[in-house]
């Protein structure tokens, strides 16, 4: 009897796995797209179609080198990298996926072309909130400085307080903010303590009442990952300037 139920359970898992994998794919691509466009009216199949048409990706190592296969010779797929598991590794041992969005079609641009063809760069991030993990996709415009949009998520932040990071109200505050200052130094974006702050500069967003620790977690997460991605960003910002100056 035990063997029978064990076999039945195994078969059930095998049957459900493709469904679960498809749901994970939809959820991942939904979050990535959600950082750059409004996806509220898109059903799952439209999300997949839009993603496949308008997005390409690349995976880097800590030295900003493109990596395409792992140590076992298997292809590395950006969308399949588990950012949570990746986060547990030392920064120099992680993989860093980057997603590039084109408002026309992914067939019309190459991964290594910048400025003229890539509308937005999306960077996945992971960190800690008050109670559990927080994560996000932060999109930069083609200047690789201005925030196009963000899509934050969390596991267990306090409802009505830290959990607000996943709301449009909070996420919209990040739009048009700058991560570099006029000297080209990485400043990142800081969520201020408290809400309804009167003085907010281009590197700051208004805070959330009663959620200082969650806000601090966001600040640390964003700064840490942009520090890791900074080599790639600086290189592609330079390429973008060169391409623009030639036109």
Where are these regions (language model features)?
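Flexible, solvent-exposed loop/hinge segments and secondary-structure transition points
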Residues: 1-247
């Amino acid at each position: 009897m035990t063997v029978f139920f064990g076999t039945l359970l195994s078969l059930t898992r095998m049957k459900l796995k493709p469904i679960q994998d498809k749901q994970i794919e939809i959820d991942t691509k939904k979050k990535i797209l959600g950082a750059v466009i409004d996806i509220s009216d898109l059903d799952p199949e439209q999300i997949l179609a839009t993603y496949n048409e308008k997005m390409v990706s690349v995976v880097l190592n800590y030295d900003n080198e493109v990596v395409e296969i792992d140590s076992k010779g298997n292809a590395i797929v950006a969308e399949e990298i588990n950012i949570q598991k990746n986060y547990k590794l030392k920064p120099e041992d992680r993989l860093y996926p980057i997603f590039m969005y084109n408002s026309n079609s992914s067939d019309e641009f190459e991964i290594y072309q910048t400025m003229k063809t890539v509308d937005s760069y999306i960077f996945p991030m992971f960190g800690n909130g008050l109670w559990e993990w927080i994560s996000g996709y932060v999109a930069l415009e083609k200047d690789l400085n201005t925030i196009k949009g963000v899509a934050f998520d969390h596991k267990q932040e306090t409802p009505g307080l830290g959990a607000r990071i996943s709301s449009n109200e909070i996420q919209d505050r990040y739009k048009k903010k700058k991560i570099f200052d006029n000297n080209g130094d990485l400043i990142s974006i800081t969520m201020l303590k408290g809400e309804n702050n009167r003085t907010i500069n281009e590197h700051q967003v208004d805070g959330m009442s009663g959620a200082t620790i969650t806000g601090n977690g966001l600040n640390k997460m964003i700064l840490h990952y942009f520090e890791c991605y900074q080599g790639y960003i600086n290189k592609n910002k330079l390429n973008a300037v060169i391409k623009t100056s030639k036109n």
